[in-house]
Amino acid sequence: MTVEGIGNLLVLKEGELFVCARRDGDIRACARSGQGLYSSDTRHLSELSLTVGGRSPTPLSMTTQSPYEAVVDLANAGLEGEGGSPIPARALHIRRTFLLGDRLYQRILIRNHSGTRVATEVAIELAADFADMFEVRGACEPVFREPRSALGRIAHGISFGYVGKDEIRRETVVEVTPPGRVVKDSADKARLTWALALEPLQSMEAEFTVEPSLEGSRAPQHSFRGARAIFTSKSKEWLDSCARIDCGSAGLHRVLSRGVSDLRSLMTPSEDGEVIAAGIPWYVASFGRDALLTSLEMLLLTPEPARKTLVHLARMQAGTDDPYRDAEPGKILHELRRGELARSGSIPHAPYYGSVDATPLFLITASAYWHWTADLDTLQQLEPAFDAALQWIDTYGDRDGDGFVEYLSRSSSGLSNHGWKDSQDSIVHVDGSPAEGPIALVEVQGYVYLAKRGMADLYRAFGRSERAALLETEAAKLVEAFNEVFWMPEEDTYALALDGNKNQVRSVSSNPGHCLFSGIVDANRAQSVADRLLETDMFSGWGVRTLSSRSLAYNPMSYHNGSIWPHDNAIIAAGLKRYGLSQEALTVARAVLEAALESPESRLPELFCGFEREEGRTYVPYPVACSPQAWAAAAPFMLLQSLMGISADAPAELLSICAPVLPDHLDHVRLQNVRVGDSRMSLDFQKKDLATSCALVDQTGEIRLSLDE
């Protein structure tokens, strides 16, 4: 992926729209640039640049007010005014306020702080290239389109239009108040200008909106203030529906607050309600694996995203065998795209099913949702989807009948690797050579085990006790075979995978940590697996690396071969706590939470580089990591849930707390509005010396609290 770094961009998202701009508020996209205004995998605005007197203003500050609003303060550069008189630098204060919702709203306020009259021109350059996100990412070569777009004038602005190879007309409609002069530069570029004439301390204000449109559809127009009120109300509704976490650390409180707001911003409209998009800017789309794992991570916060994710993925479940899309009956989607290339069939993503783990994760999430909500009505409606998913695991998943689930890509346009580490070079032998398929990933066997155990409980609730007993028998057989075939005694951990010849892929990786999470690890080996994960070649001080630094394929700057992923570490910490390894879980959680505290935005990115932690230095960012990213934003909530030992059994009206622990810098955590079934609870966790206790503060409903401190 050859794209610009995005760490310093202004990023906003609301609904279907998101914008990535420079910190001065300009959008100046070029090849392989993430900058732009996007909707449905299409860049509807590739340039939005402000000049005053023909020069770009000087940035002063940028503040993100919320995931959908930002304020940029600027000052003019030295200019020549009317009659050639000089306008000194910083004579004009320029404020650009961005608001994103059903369209992009921008308000520009210019105030004259010089002692004399200022007269010059204000201009905004606009362009729309309608690039597909796969072109922007560099995932495919740029598509030649002729004509690229057509520009037209409307009553209060301009519109750009383009008919794609999918025969869909896409438009970008720009409306301006007060009306400016429109200058058409080319087929896909225009300039709006206003004459600026300000006496000392006088101000000028202009507003404009940019609305992406498909086939002429338009959203109702709102004023800037009215739009802000709508989005603020939606944000408050989300916050009120979530559990509240208060703690004694101001830094951690900021991390948690940022996570809650980022997760809300990533909720994206679909036919099934709002579902979680994976991350901005590259993955604002439905990803099965990402949505499911994020839903699991945030069950303590709210179970509602899990319900919507299950309903959405069940509706999109594959019903036919389609090699181009790596689809087979019962399989859960990997990625759903809605841009020109996907709709026209140029790429197989409408949807694409190249994920080996999304299907068992679908079942795991269903079971977890059941335990948190006891919502049998929703789950019974999805029963046919569960049946189909289990059938996929046992037939298409287990390709050769050896009891393990494997993958082998059949699509010439799809992914070569189908686990969460899906980059081309991520599944390698210790000598760095790529493993040949079919590949049986270590963590996927754990997912299948946990899926069958969880579905056995759910099927009993459905009244299908014989099916439940069969699933338990299958899970028990898998545990035995797994621990025999995947174990590497000389490394005291499990192999990354089995290759197509059933040989171990003997690389030491983070993947076995997911096996702790699933419970497939033999109890006598859990400590060994934990110790191996925390050796210096795996644990950097900022978290567990994806691949051992002793591997020939190790690269701390790579995507999957030595980097550190917060969600990966959250799952590992949950697995460690599952086996009673509280101090090891605390070590992992502390590292990741301290990385979050180091972030200037109190936000965990998708991943960061795997370099060793050094005194006085922060982690090294991965330059094109998504930020915000769903499963990274949700990771702190899973970490806290694991450390505090919280598990729910809503069908039994029970919430259990087992051996809670808190990090060194945290002495107190209060949870409020925690939902278990139809009940709500508030809990206090207090640490004194080395012991952490839990007390019930308040509750509604019949839920019982079980304490094992």
Regions found by a protein language model. Name each.
Residues 1-91, 100-103, 115-117, 129-135, ...:
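An extended acidic
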Residues 625-667:
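Catalytic cores of secreted or luminal carbohydrate-active enzymes
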Residues 220-234, 251-258, 302-316, 375-394, ...:
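Extended, well-ordered alpha-helical scaffold segments
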Residues 284-416, 442-445, 449, 505, ...:
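Aromatic-rich carbohydrate-recognition surfaces in CAZymes
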Residues 71-76, 246-286, 311-353, 399-440, ...:
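Extended glycan-interaction surfaces of carbohydrate-active proteins
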Residues 67-92, 174, 659-685:
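Edge strands and adjacent loops of beta-rich recognition modules
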Residues 92, 103-105, 112-285, 376-380, ...:
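Acidic/polar, glycine-enriched structural segments that form the non-catalytic walls/loops
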Residues 113, 119, 197-199, 205, ...:
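Beta-rich accessory regions
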